[in-house]
């Protein structure tokens, strides 16, 4: 099986790459430079007409939407333990609900904070402030849950931990959001980043940026 991940360092494709690393499989990567607008280039639109990352090509077939990609990887590589299992069909869907929440609800708030200009052609300060307020509410909920639990689902890591980490850490990058208000999230972040699979993700991303001659962000 030939797998290629189309990604950009620090984007939500970082979560997808972490899942691939946890699965311990061989895969190729192709960086799509979001800063230069490569995602909207004719060449990339031939790969993914949605013009976004991540995109995962498996034996010539393309899969998009992070929550769907992660769900498929969990099916293909169950031994990796990307998501918790349950014999109860309703409980078994909870991780998929959480991933959809990350993608459809939380990610747009991240975008409000980091890229408010995408929401309007006018003044952006109100949009960013609204995103910061919303993320504060969400982070309070994250912190309450993680204060009494090592990982999102208890004592065992899942890819949802990386997705939640990506949400709050990306919001805070560049001091745009006051993450220090939530010490439980700082502790959770340290646990996520300490995992060998995540360290391999960081190395791959650094290598991709260096190969492209791009700087490594301070909050990487």
Positions of the model-derived regions?
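GST-like domain detector, emphasizing the conserved glutathione-binding G-site
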Residues: 1-129, 219
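Short, solvent-exposed turn/loop segments enriched in Gly/Ser/Thr/Pro and often Arg
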Residues: 33, 159, 205
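GST-like fold's C-terminal all-alpha helical module
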Residues: 102-194
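Active-site-flanking alpha-helical
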Residues: 74, 167-168, 202
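Phosphate-coordinating loops and pocket residues in cytosolic domains that bind phosphorylated ligands
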Residues: 46, 194, 203
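Short, flexible loop/turn segments with low-complexity composition
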Residues: 87, 200-208
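Acidic/histidine-enriched, glycine/proline-rich intrinsically disordered or flexible terminal extensions
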Residues: 205-220
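Residue-level recognition of oxygen-bearing side chains
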Residues: 68, 184, 197
């Amino acid at each position: 099986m030939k797998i290629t991940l189309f990604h950009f360092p620090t984007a939500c494709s970082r979560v997808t790459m972490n899942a691939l690393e946890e699965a311990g499989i061989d895969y190729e990567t192709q960086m799509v430079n979001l800063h230069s607008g490569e995602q909207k280039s004719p060449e990339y639109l031939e790969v993914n007409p949605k013009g976004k990352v991540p995109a995962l090509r498996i034996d010539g077939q393309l899969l998009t939407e992070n929550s769907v990609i992660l769900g498929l990887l969990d099916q293909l590589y169950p031994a990796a333990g990307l998501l918790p299992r349950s014999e109860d069909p309703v409980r078994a869907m909870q991780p998929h609900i959480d991933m959809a929440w990350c993608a459809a609800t939380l990610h747009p708030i991240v975008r409000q904070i980091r890229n408010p200009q995408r929401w309007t052609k006018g003044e952006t300060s109100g949009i960013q402030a609204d995103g910061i307020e919303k993320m504060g509410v969400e982070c309070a909920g994250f912190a309450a849950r993680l204060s009494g639990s090592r990982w999102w689902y208890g004592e065992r890591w899942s890819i949802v931990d990386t997705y939640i980490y990506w949400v709050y850490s990306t919001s805070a990058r560049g001091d745009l959001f006051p993450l220090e208000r939530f010490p439980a999230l700082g502790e959770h972040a340290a646990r996520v980043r300490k995992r060998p699979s995540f360290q391999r993700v960081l190395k791959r991303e650094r290598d991709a940026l260096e190969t492209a001659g791009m700087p490594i962000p301070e909050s990487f």
